[in-house]
Every structure is written in C-alpha cells, then in structure tokens.
C-alpha cells in the first residue's frame, strides 16, 4: 500500500478541484497512482453530478452584466440557500451573465456550449455540481441590446431587474428599475398584460360580484371595474411611483422627458414547486427498508 502524502493530495486537488478528502480517498484507491486517482475522481464527480441532477432547484441567485448599451440578466438555481452564498456558485452565475452579454447565445444550450476558462460553461457547471454535491441549473436569461440605455438593479441576489430606456439622466432608469423590484408590475402598459392573467382576474371578479346578489347590469359593471383596477395595479406606467406618491410612473417619465421601452424582472424560484421534506416519513421508510434487508 502506497503512502499518501499531503503533497500528493494537494497536487491532485489542484488538478481536479475536488475536495481534499475525496482526493485522499481516490489516491488510496489508486494505490498512489495520480493518473488513476484522477480517473477515479472524474467518475465519482460525474456520478455525484448525475445523482444531483434529478433534484429540484428552487433556490438560487439572479446575476446581471451591463456593458454600454448591452445588458444581460440570468437566473441560476440550486437546491439550498446555503449554496447561494458559495463563492464558486456566485462566480458561475456572474460568468453566465458576462457570457450572455458578450456572445448573445440563442438559447440555454448555446449558452452552455460557450467557452469558460478552457472548458465549456456546461462542463464547468457539471464540475461544480460534483464538488458541491448539489444540483444547480441555469434556468433562464434575457439580453437587451438597444440604441438607448440599459440599466440593471439587483435587490440582494433574489430579485433582478433590467430596463431598456431613454433619458437624459441615467438616474431615471435606476429609479424605474428599483420601482419594478418593489412593485413587481407584470407588463409595461395595460395593453401588454397577458390575456391569461386578465381572464383569471375576470373569473375571480365574476365570482365575487355574483355573491353580491345585485342585478345583472350592476354585476357587469362591478366586474369591469375590478378588471380595470387590476390592469392599473399591474402595469408599470399606471402604477404610483414609489419615490413620489403624487404621480404615476408615466407622469414621472413625461416630466423627465424619458421613455421606458422594455423591462424584465426575475424573482428566484418563481413558479418552481419546492419539495416539502417529510422527515418522519423519511425515517419510517428507512426503518422499513432496514427490516426488509
């Protein structure tokens, strides 16, 4: 049995980026052969990544990159809040945003194929899954390239906003981005609100109005009033501006001779169903499995 020294472990770690204990185990299994140990680690890390790939990634971060009139916003997910504070995970998210801004990939597959530190982004992602032991995925991204200006705003790491705008004062764009993060509009104007959201709101309003027992013509007016109110509440231009409750966002833009052409907001995990762990059931299942063994 070969003697495994700290220097051998350090060299293998530098080569593979694997955890120290994993490196030591691999060297022991390979009887001190660094080439075999590297192969063992690649298999183990690959297996670790494959096992993690089926787990839900509802945590994560939003990262952004703005260079001149080009901006990128990306959501990168992981399984636990703990990993969102990991420096390597944060570096991967920021690298994603930079690659998107620089290369304009057509989709997630094209993004994953882009080069990063001598490998592809997808290879770097798989390696990080292997090292951390937790699934992570690039969920979505958007890229703005405009003749005007682009600004991004991150509220912590969980909410990200990017705005395409025209204004003499860049602070206007920053204020609008902060407003969007706070008020969470779903569209620029009432006309842009998705039809499915309007239909859902109308259905709820109809049920509430029907319970009032009022005449049909009154019920119809109540429904239309509710829908109209909803459209004002969820469209950016109609919302009351957070920095001045005496005017709407649209009025503020007119006063400053500014326009907002488009915006995107990402909220981490939005729409992802998180797995609810049942610890008691998990223990019971393990006990039952042990009895059958």
Curated annotation (Swiss-Prot):
Q: Where in or outside the cell is it found? A: Cytoplasm
Q: Which superkingdom is the protein from?
A: Bacteria
Q: Under the cellular component aspect of Gene Ontology, which terms does the record hold?
A: cytoplasm
Asked if the record carries the keyword Cytoplasm, the reply is yes
- Which residue ranges are recorded for the region named Involved in Mg(2+) ion dislocation from EF-Tu? 80-83
- GO molecular-function terms, A-Z: translation elongation factor activity
Q: Which residues form the signal peptide?
A: none
Main location (coarse class): cytoplasm
Any keyword Calcium? no
Q: Please provide the record's keywords in A-Z order.
A: Cytoplasm, Elongation factor, Protein biosynthesis
Cross-referenced NCBIfam families, in alphabetical order?
tsf
Q: Can you tell me which family this protein belongs to?
A: Belongs to the EF-Ts family.
Give the function comment from the record: Associates with the EF-Tu.GDP complex and induces the exchange of GDP to GTP. It remains bound to the aminoacyl-tRNA.EF-Tu.GTP complex up to the GTP hydrolysis stage on the ribosome.
Could you identify this protein by its name? Elongation factor Ts
Annotated organism of origin? Herminiimonas arsenicoxydans
Task: Name the gene for this chain.
Answer: tsf
